[in-house]
Amino acid sequence: MDGASKVFFLDEIEDQRYEILMGDGVLGKKQENNARIEVSYLTTAGSESNGVRTFVFSGVLENPNGVSPSAFTTNITSTTASAGGEEIESTQKIKYTAPKAYGTQDRAVTADDYEAIVRQVYPATSDIIIFGGEDQEPPEYGKVFIALKPKDASYLTSLTKKSIVDELKKFVVASVEPRLIDPSILFVELTSKIYYNGSMTDQTPSQIRDKVIGGVQSYLDTSDTEKFNGKFRYSKMVGVIDDADKSINSNLTSVTMRKDFYPSLNSTFYYEVCFQNAFDEDCDDPVLSSTGFRVTEYPNFDVYVEDRNKKIVLYRLDSVTGEKVVLDSDIGDIDYVKGELKMYNLTIIKGSFFDNRISVRVKPLSNDIKALREVYLDVDVANSSFTAYKE
């Protein structure tokens, strides 16, 4: 760059505004007095652009000669929803992150250094946890593992992960290898029956329900529940539901844990699903349930799993009676104490949803749920059930 370079500089100033600086004749071309400068720019919708799956081609299609075809068809397929959009950093957030970023001194040594640099590289980070390879089983020395939960998405795309790691390598010291891994998301689902005094309010059950959902979401937004090393406190959640409206007398709320996994389609695989929380072994009904999926042995109908006699069984539903028909009485083991599922030699050809993921649900031994290390705790309000009853 020299004094003739046609460049300009963009700085952020007060009140979240931007300032354009032209060259001074040494760094960039200097503008003449009274020169007229026209500026055009694109703005984004920030976080409002997240979660988009359907896209339409709105451009102009031309061949190398600049000629457009008289008729053409475009088909845009999105494998994942858009993510990563973020609002401008607030002054409060800058005051919080700036000292941490300065403390790294542009090198990644401690866990705090890695966190500050990753948040700088990828601002749309909801939560992050870093641990050394020596804590892995088996140990992987010389590696640093980074589990990152993005905002408005469960996982990062492979392209985004590669971009973050490539940028992070500029700050890593010695021969340490950074590894960015997906979080293991542990979902907590609630089934709540809310009883309220109809003589104290003219609100309908649906209005009471909406108030409860709003109260629960507000609590989750301000508590340390949804995060790595998060803890779900049952008594606090019951209190939040009761306090959602003065007319509420009580609530009966049950807790279910859920994990989603993505099978390797058309391959015989061993699957292990760890919940890190013990299961309620003394239930009369099965502790384990799943969404439907398909396997090579039974490709024409959905199959499900549940636990019986400490074993995982594979079954289908009778199309007429709806009764469970056992197809295999032993496809894996369930460890109620460790909170683990192990399924052997499954060849899955189709999952439950559009992205082929499969959901498994279990009843926990304790209603207080914890998440450790790379496990991210997420209270899934959208898939929870809240029903209000007038007394």
Give the ranges of each region predicted by the language model.
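Catalytic P-loop NTP-binding/switch module of NTPases
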Residues: 16-22, 26-109, 113-116, 381-384, ...
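Extended Gly/Ser/Thr-rich low-complexity repeat segments
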Residues: 30-44, 348-370
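Carbohydrate-recognition loop of C-type lectin domains
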Residues: 105-228
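An aromatic-glycine-centered, glycine-rich loop/turn in mixed alpha/beta architecture
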Residues: 69, 74-76, 207-298, 304-305
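A surface-exposed beta-strand-loop module
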Residues: 1-35, 340-351
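Extended, beta-strand-rich, solvent-exposed assembly scaffolds of outer structural proteins
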Residues: 223, 299-353
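Feature of secretome-associated and extracellular-like proteins
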Residues: 357-391
